[in-house]
């Protein structure tokens, strides 16, 4: 039986089409995925992301533990509330999950991990935390709502108390603050400004309704996927998994190689991959008619004249740009163009950086 978030009833009242998403009943859309997508790019939309897992870590050695557990280095976190994106890797350098870490105090950090990997993540974290005497608290008492879009912060702020408005005033991207009963973070998965707001489960339905009244459009998983793909953001299980290195998933920037004497899980394997060479994640753009879909083959001829083949990890029609875009994992050496096999047709595509839209504007 699929689980329901505390907002399940609100979704049905808003006319959602519900689907089973990794064991959770979640809204796919509320009538028009396209309208929801455009609302986030031009105004304000909101997503129930309560299926994600918030994990609080307490203990005097928490920073030391996270420096070993994660490929990115929490030594960078010195300002209260600052957030960091990282891969959590296995010994062979594969990605167990990608997550966000918030720093509050030396003995209090918060992780936000994916729903699809919840049990695996908790088991891995618990196993490796034992020698560090970390107190692990899974915050199933909290719901999480993402409010995203150019007008999202302004509209969300109409629900805040004076204390909460003051707490978020001037807050830079990738920070979080606890203000009253809300944890408000300037993070998201759309390429737009906004907040991700955690609150007690019993407050979630009223908060959702108030956001609707403030003119924030409910959005489902469908729009969430096209928005994150336009923004060039990875989806676990597609761009990366336990068999795929962050180096092959455009996550090289999340690996803190320095200081060289910091040991973290997967470091040795990554150093070998870096020396030998590895696949890369690129963007693809197809302006001709047709849609780039997941798992379609991508072919190109490298500088030595050798035929090479990669694969589309995520592909869709971009509502913002009006043509098809994709992320693809390919061998090193790809040039500016490639061929994608769509049924019996060989379609030319342009190779770009793996990001297409930022703050509503085309970058590809």
UniProtKB/Swiss-Prot annotation:
Alphabetically list the UniProt keywords.
Aminotransferase, Transferase
What EC number(s) has UniProt assigned to this enzyme? 2.1.2.10
Reactions catalysed: N(6)-[(R)-S(8)-aminomethyldihydrolipoyl]-L-lysyl-[protein] + (6S)-5,6,7,8-tetrahydrofolate = N(6)-[(R)-dihydrolipoyl]-L-lysyl-[protein] + (6R)-5,10-methylene-5,6,7,8-tetrahydrofolate + NH4(+)
Going by the record, the broad EC class of this enzyme is: transferase
Q: Which GO terms describe its cellular component?
A: cytosol; glycine cleavage complex
* One of the GO BP terms on file: glycine decarboxylation via glycine cleavage system
Give an example GO molecular function. transaminase activity
The lineage's top-level taxon is Bacteria
**Subunit structure and binding partners:** The glycine cleavage system is composed of four proteins: P, T, L and H.
Spell out the family assignment given in the record's similarity comment: Belongs to the GcvT family.
Which NCBIfam families does the protein's record reference? gcvT, PRK00389.1
Q: What PANTHER family does UniProt report for this protein, alphabetically?
A: AMINOMETHYLTRANSFERASE, AMINOMETHYLTRANSFERASE, MITOCHONDRIAL
HAMAP family this protein is in?
GcvT (MF_00259)
Q: What does this protein do?
A: The glycine cleavage system catalyzes the degradation of glycine.
Record protein name field: Aminomethyltransferase
């Amino acid at each position: 039986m699929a689980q329901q978030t505390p907002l399940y009833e609100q979704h049905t009242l808003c006319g959602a089409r519900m689907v089973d998403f990794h064991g959770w009943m979640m809204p796919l859309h509320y009538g028009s995925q396209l309208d929801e997508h455009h609302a986030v790019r031009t105004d304000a939309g909101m997503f129930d992301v309560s299926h994600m897992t918030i994990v609080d870590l307490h203990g005097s050695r928490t920073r030391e533990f996270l420096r070993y557990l994660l490929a990115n280095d929490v030594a960078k976190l010195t300002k209260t509330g600052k957030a960091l994106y990282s891969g959590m890797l296995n010994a062979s350098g594969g990605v167990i999950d990608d997550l966000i870490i918030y720093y509050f105090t030396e003995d209090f950090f918060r992780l936000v991990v994916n729903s699809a990997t919840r049990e695996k993540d908790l088991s891995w974290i618990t196993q490796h935390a034992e020698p560090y005497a970390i107190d692990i608290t899974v915050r199933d008492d909290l719901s999480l709502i993402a409010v995203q879009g150019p007008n999202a912060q302004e509209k969300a702020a109409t629900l805040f108390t004076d204390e909460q408005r003051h707490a978020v005033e001037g807050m830079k991207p990738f920070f979080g603050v606890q203000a009253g009963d809300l944890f408000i973070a300037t993070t998201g998965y759309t390429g737009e400004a906004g907040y991700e707001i955690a609150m007690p489960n019993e407050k979630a339905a009223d908060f959702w309704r108030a956001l609707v009244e403030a003119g924030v459009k409910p959005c489902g998983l469908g729009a969430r996927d096209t928005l994150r793909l336009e923004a060039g953001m990875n989806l676990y299980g597609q761009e990366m998994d336990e068999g795929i290195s962050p180096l092959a998933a455009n996550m090289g920037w999340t690996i803190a190689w320095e200081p060289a004497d910091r040991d973290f899980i997967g470091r040795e394997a990554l150093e070998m991959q870096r020396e030998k060479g590895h696949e890369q994640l690129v963007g693809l753009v197809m302006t001709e008619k047709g849609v780039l879909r997941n798992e379609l083959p991508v072919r190109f001829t490298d500088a030595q004249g050798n035929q090479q083949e990669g694969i589309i990890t995520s592909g869709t029609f971009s509502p913002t740009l009006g043509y098809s875009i994709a992320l693809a994992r390919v061998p090193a050496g790809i040039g500016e163009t490639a061929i994608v096999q769509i049924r019996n047709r060989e379609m030319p595509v342009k190779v770009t950086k793996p990001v297409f839209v930022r703050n509503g504007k085309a970058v590809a």
